[in-house]
Design a protein with these regions (language model features):
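Alpha-helical transmembrane segments of multi-pass small-molecule/ion transporters
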Residues: 1-80, 85-309, 314-367
């Protein structure tokens, strides 16, 4: 969290009697601010005529500029904290790298496919939308959940970069497998096809990860040259740190303002979609956390593994659903409900993670 030392992830157990002891006001009441941002965004979308259309019209290449701006502001301070000269220590951790790839690209899509069919056997549009959400692995918002939970910043940077590469290469193939081939082979009915190109996915990755990653790297490089590492981390980083949460709150307001009318006008459908999403986030996060602990990862890398496993790229999922099935489709609604459930659930899991941090002992293997 912003109260933690900016010099890198903490790997020793928390000594405080309370998880929130010593945190700034902004961090301590994070759940309150996020709930307020969601409520405010939903209210704006519902009460201000034409606001959702106005926000939706400000886009380039299918990418919402207000959301892109919010994510850039959110991710830049976190990525400016990363010590890029330590990334080789992460890439050399084979247990972390292999576990992350397996959980994200083998287990994650399969779990969402199973849950979508279990919970929504009679609602094919919503089911397809959920499967698309499961295919879109997180490359953006996960960096702030990881930072708030005192995860390994360098590991998060490496894993989201790895996810972005696999997203470009594998999204279309996995979409064909889970939406077309597998349902037919299992006798579950006719499949669906996605209208999405590698170029569109690459553009999404470049905007939501590439821009803030390059900005963070250049800021640290030139900042350390001018101020030295100690000065950069003690003087500059504390000034930009709070902007990560400002960007997160702005993004949430814009996102829910865009979809406020849709969400509030179909509450029963939202509830049906929410159930498999809740099960998915719980299974992925707790399963990945247990895996990290079982294979001997330290707390910071276990937290990073868990949050990268549970998070999803809702921007890509919504864009694909709208481009393929239309803005008023059930598939698009499933994509919209994704962040409605993901944001508060992962905020809660940040506090769970911090509480469990004290169960880890210093000096465990895997770091």
């Amino acid at each position: 969290m912003t109260a933690a030392p900016p010099a890198g992830p903490a790997t020793t157990p928390a000594a405080q009697s309370s998880v929130t002891a010593g945190l700034s006001t902004l961090d301590r009441y994070l759940a309150v601010w996020i709930l307020a941002a969601m409520t405010f965004g939903l209210g704006l979308g519902r009460l201000v005529p034409g606001l959702d259309d106005a926000l939706a019209s400000v886009e380039v290449g299918g990418i919402s500029l207000p959301i892109a701006l919010g994510l850039l502001v959110m991710m830049y301070p976190v990525l400016a904290k990363v010590r890029y000269d330590r990334l080789d220590a992460v890439t050399g951790d084979r247990k972390l790298m292999i576990s992350s790839l397996a959980v994200n690209w083998v287990l994650g899509p399969a779990v969402m496919f199973a849950l979508a069919w279990i919970f929504l056997p009679d609602l094919p549009e919503y089911r397809t939308g959920l499967i698309i959400v499961g295919l879109a692995r997180c490359i953006a918002m996960v960096v702030i959940w990881n930072d708030l939970a005192c995860g390994d910043r360098e590991a998060a940077a490496v894993l989201v970069a790895l996810n972005s590469v696999f997203q470009v290469l594998a999204f279309g193939l996995l979409g064909w497998f889970y939406l077309d081939l597998l349902p037919g082979r299992l006798g579950l009915g006719d499949g669906e096809r996605l209208d999405i190109s590698m170029v569109e996915i690459a553009l999404n990755v470049a905007v939501f990860l590439g821009v803030p990653l390059v900005a963070g790297f250049l800021t640290r490089r030139f900042g350390e040259r001018r101020l030295g590492r100690a000065g950069y981390e003690s003087r500059f980083l504390p000034r930009i740190g709070p902007w990560a949460l400002y960007g997160l709150l702005f993004t949430i307001v814009v996102l829910f303002a865009l979809q406020g009318g849709t969400i509030t006008s179909r509450p029963l459908d939202v509830a049906r979609i929410a159930l498999p999403l809740l099960a998915y986030f719980a299974l992925m996060w707790f399963g990945a956390f247990a895996l990290g602990k079982a294979i001997g990862l330290t707390y910071d890398r276990t937290a990073t593994l868990a949050f990268t496993a549970a998070g999803n790229n809702f921007e890509l999922a919504i864009a694909v659903a709208i481009a393929t099935f239309g803005v008023t489709s059930g598939q698009a609604l499933s994509g919209v409900v994704g962040p409605l459930i993901e944001v508060p659930v992962l905020v809660g899991l940040v506090y769970v993670s911090l509480a469990w941090r004290r169960r880890f002992t210093a000096g465990r293997p895997g770091s």
